[in-house]
Amino acid sequence: MPHIQFLPPEPVVLVSRVADDPDPAGPGLHVAKVAVGDCTIVDARTPCAPLQGRFAVWTVALQLHSPDTPRSLTLRKRYSDFVRFRERLLLCLPPPLRRAVPPLPPPVPWYDAWRYSDVNLDRAWLAARRAGLERFLQQVLLNRALVAAAPVVVRGFLEPPAAHRWVPVRA
């Protein structure tokens, strides 16, 4: 039986906007640097779901501006997380700002869908996808106008999924 490695997301703490903060994006959303690093290949096949495949989880490193000290943040995201982020971003941005949102690297072509795992996990394919994801995040997260126009969507992308949030139980 293959070993499945669970990669829990690291906790994210974003600073809330205070009443006297003139920047609508808030102090916690000033990104200074974005880098998409290597990916981890996750094997999702189980005896109950043998047709599930393997997929890549990307490591995203962010350097945030902070009034006190610079903070860094490391995220782990699948390609589908980037797709959802871009879709939500385009839905909430005004038309003039939508043009500033670059396209994502393309998904596996339909004619290669029958060998999806082979194509999607090819080293050259992954290198091109990593470069495209990094370009996308740099053009979005380093653009203060985009972040200010959609802070809720940006925060949603930077926070771990609800299923991974720890909620204390009250006794």
Curated annotation (Swiss-Prot):
<keyword id="KW-0472">Membrane</keyword>
<dbReference type="InterPro" id="IPR036871">
    <property type="entry name" value="PX_dom_sf"/>
</dbReference>
<dbReference type="GO" id="GO:0072657">
    <property type="term" value="P:protein localization to membrane"/>
</dbReference>
<dbReference type="GO" id="GO:0010008">
    <property type="term" value="C:endosome membrane"/>
</dbReference>
<keyword id="KW-0926">Vacuole</keyword>
<comment type="similarity">
    <text>Belongs to the YPT35 family.</text>
</comment>
<dbReference type="GO" id="GO:0071561">
    <property type="term" value="C:nucleus-vacuole junction"/>
</dbReference>
<dbReference type="InterPro" id="IPR037917">
    <property type="entry name" value="Ypt35_PX"/>
</dbReference>
<dbReference type="Pfam" id="PF00787">
    <property type="entry name" value="PX"/>
</dbReference>
<dbReference type="InterPro" id="IPR001683">
    <property type="entry name" value="PX_dom"/>
</dbReference>
<dbReference type="GO" id="GO:0032266">
    <property type="term" value="F:phosphatidylinositol-3-phosphate binding"/>
</dbReference>
<feature type="domain" description="PX">
    <location>
        <begin position="1"/>
        <end position="164"/>
    </location>
</feature>
<dbReference type="GO" id="GO:0030674">
    <property type="term" value="F:protein-macromolecule adaptor activity"/>
</dbReference>
<dbReference type="GO" id="GO:0036010">
    <property type="term" value="P:protein localization to endosome"/>
</dbReference>
<dbReference type="GO" id="GO:0005774">
    <property type="term" value="C:vacuolar membrane"/>
</dbReference>
<comment type="function">
    <text>Recruits the lipid transfer protein VPS13 to endosomal and vacuolar membranes.</text>
</comment>
<protein>
    <recommendedName>
        <fullName>Endosomal/vacuolar adapter protein YPT35</fullName>
    </recommendedName>
</protein>
<keyword id="KW-0967">Endosome</keyword>
